[in-house]
């Protein structure tokens, strides 16, 4: 990567984008792409990019934003028209973290820009590169891709630019424009206020006088009961059919309903479903208790709302207690049935592999119950077992006879006294002076012995020639 940075020209200008994925530092090539950098810096100074979304995300390729409409077709430059492309021979799409202008064709640059997520040689000489993401903020840029994307490369929950900050402005002559926001139309509420309210003309009705009297009565009652809950006692005070005693039993009914619901929910959580007879028994006990205390609750209804609340709590506690008792009885019954079934099975199969399997199972279940839980006691037990094994191993080694000629018995403890023995394969040392079938013939003409032999053989040949 070092050769890439050496090839790229030095930057001149810096902007900080504060996004929902984190801050992103962008250094600008204002000398190589002056129009694009001036356009980008001025839009940042004018808060043009604030609250805009990254409307296009292509994993491994680009992340595009800068459109105030969020559609991918909006946005305009500070020049009032699209400006020309600015290509440079030392700026190429050869890595991630580059910032370039988005366009729909040649010389069609506006306000939209994109970040590269990898090498993209197909974009060279098509899009103007004007900056790069620096430092650790490149990882915040990569977080922009961690969103759900639909078939049209649009994120369902897109990240957005919260604000922009120009840290270093190489263009001192930039004057931010005052962007006039369009005046909002009057709200619907104001329009409704301007509309005149309709008046009811009861003279047009055949029963106009009666309707007018009912309307006045309703208005008067609604004004008097404004801000309070309304009931038949408030509206019909002179009705002789209504009782003057508050209906406290309704609260009790609600309490019983809540108790039944709580009991049913808890029973579903613990055991799945309770039997119908158990539910009926619980309902009867709660109903009896409610009947006993109904008169006392009616008398003490005027004392306040704390007593009914406390009473309902007591009823809930009693319901929970009943539920626990029923569950305990049911569990006891199930355990008894299981024990009976197990005894019957044992009697049915007195002997054989099944009985042996059951005995082994009971043995290991008893050992598992004796095993302590995790903690210091479990660690102490493990160390004790290890020391016991070591002592057993040393004892087996010491008790082994020196000359064990008998065949070893294969059992669980036989391996402890086993001795590892290897076949004796000693090799003979080769002696150069000894001739053997395995001796290799080595001839060196520079050896003095070989030289003497050659001279002697030559001498013998000369003597033979002379004799002839």
Swiss-Prot record:
Biological role stated in the UniProt entry: As part of the spliceosome, plays a role in pre-mRNA splicing. Probable inactive PPIase with no peptidyl-prolyl cis-trans isomerase activity. As a component of the minor spliceosome, involved in the splicing of U12-type introns in pre-mRNAs.
Question: Coiled coil: which residue ranges?
Answer: 206-229, 309-342
Asked whether the UniProt record includes Zinc among its keywords, one would answer no
> Predominant location of this chain?
nucleus
Q: What is this protein called?
A: Spliceosome-associated protein CWC27 homolog
Subcellular location(s): the record lists: Nucleus
Give one Pfam hit by family name.
Pro_isomerase
Q: Taxonomy-wise, where does this protein's organism fall, top ranks first? A: Eukaryota, Metazoa, Chordata, Craniata, Vertebrata
Record's PANTHER family?
PEPTIDYL-PROLYL CIS-TRANS ISOMERASE-RELATED, SPLICEOSOME-ASSOCIATED PROTEIN CWC27 HOMOLOG
